[in-house]
Amino acid sequence: MRSKDKISYFYDGDVGSVYFGPNHPMKPHRLCMTHHLILAYGLHSKMEVYRPHKAYPIEMAQFHSPDYVEFLQRINPENQNLFPNEMARYNLGEDCPVFEDLFEFCQLYAGGTIDAARRLNNKLCDIAINWAGGLHHAKKCDASGFCYINDLVLGILELLKHHPRVLYIDIDVHHGDGVEEAFYFTDRVMTVSFHKFGDKFFPGTGDVKEIGEREGKFYAINVPLKDGIDDSSFNRLFRTIISKVVEIYQPGAIVLQCGADSLARDRLGCFNLSIDGHAECVKFVKKFNLPLLVTGGGGYTKENVARCWTVETGILLDTELPNEIPENDYIKYFAPDFSLKIPGGHIENLNTKSYISSIKVQILENLRYIQHAPSVQMQEVPPDFYIPDFDEDEQNPDVRADQRSRDKQIQRDDEYFDGDNDNDAS
């Protein structure tokens, strides 16, 4: 057991200021609400807080096609009508709209996950958190499901520089299809996704029979669930599967995507999980004492997203939080009871004991085929992308500092961050 985990937390106020559109369910403003709730509970004083670097196009192209990345850089609301063919090719439109500062938004959330992975690789922390990340649907050459750049894949690729095997766990209500697809043919990443499946629910993939191919056969695990699963059923299944996966696969690091749309009463969800039930997964994964990268994901009832990720930040810090939400810039959103925890829902649970048992049996049977962790011929670890040495005397105050200089500027108080009352607030 580690005596006390060292936590790195990544946040940039600009990431929550973008606007997908008036009727779009994705509200990045939820990230500002989460951050201010974390501040209100004083959790920032127990972590190392960093502003992430903006991911470079060359970093994004470690997974995504250069043409797609270049188009994301070029497109904006004013010129999008000039590129109807490219818009269709890259799946940009209603679900994945073009909005102001789209590429910078992608740079910030992807940069946070890449930075988190690098700090873990360099043993500068035990746990790294980027609630802005977790956009698991993005594909190599196109956007999907409100996701443009797949930060999770980029983070896992970083972790693979130092770890023979990485375990990816996804508790979003939607199948983690983009991450699974990226690593479907390799045994160096095991993907485990717990999600709603059936009834034409997006993205339509994630059947228990989808297990990977070639070298990756049996290294993709899908746990397809029906409407209404509750805390006890979900947590029992989660503990059984994840404990067996860790025992057999022996990962060097874990990436945990904590999509909050699996909570009860989510605008797009259909599960009955309480915040305690959702957070129990985080608590369980933390107990393995492996390098852990934690991200956000879906979540479309924004006040509950903020509640959930604040509670889970507390769990990662071994800090119990009082249920009464303290005063903060977004306090009005938590009316009328101003409680941190929300209970489970009351949708009929269609996941019968026999159904859950059959899913569990199939998954555990597949795991028998990989009783021994795969052996990996390790090559020389490639360096992180080159960032020029920082000369403090030559630093331009009008230009955002690079990652190395920002690492010297760790802050433990509120004033580091853009707030609604600041003159330069977003």
From Swiss-Prot:
Pfam families membership: Hist_deacetyl (PF00850)
Residues in coiled coil: none
GO terms, biological process: chromatin organization; negative regulation of seed germination; regulation of leaf senescence
Keyword terms, alphabetized: Chromatin regulator, Cytoplasm, Hydrolase, Metal-binding, Nucleus, Repressor, Transcription, Transcription regulation, Zinc
Top-rank taxon, per record: Eukaryota
Principal location listed in the UniProt entry: nucleus
Compositional bias annotation for Acidic residues: 415-426
Broadest EC class assigned to this enzyme: hydrolase
Free-text remark on how the cofactor is bound: Binds 1 zinc ion per subunit.
Entry's Gene Ontology cellular component terms: cytoplasm; cytosol; nucleus
Chain intervals for the UniProt region annotation (Disordered): 383-426
InterPro entries: HDAC_PDAC, His_deacetylse, His_deacetylse_1, His_deacetylse_dom, His_deacetylse_dom_sf, Ureohydrolase_dom_sf
Cellular compartments annotated: Nucleus; Cytoplasm, Cytosol
Alphabetical list of SUPFAM superfamilies matching this protein: Arginase/deacetylase
UniProt catalytic activity: N(6)-acetyl-L-lysyl-[histone] + H2O = L-lysyl-[histone] + acetate
PANTHER family per UniProt: HISTONE DEACETYLASE 9, HISTONE DEACETYLASE HDAC1-RELATED
Annotated family: Belongs to the histone deacetylase family. HD type 1 subfamily.
Function: Responsible for the deacetylation of lysine residues on the N-terminal part of the core histones (H2A, H2B, H3 and H4). Histone deacetylation gives a tag for epigenetic repression and plays an important role in transcriptional regulation, cell cycle progression and developmental events. Histone deacetylases act via the formation of large multiprotein complexes.
Protein name: Histone deacetylase 9
Organism whose genome encodes this protein: Arabidopsis thaliana
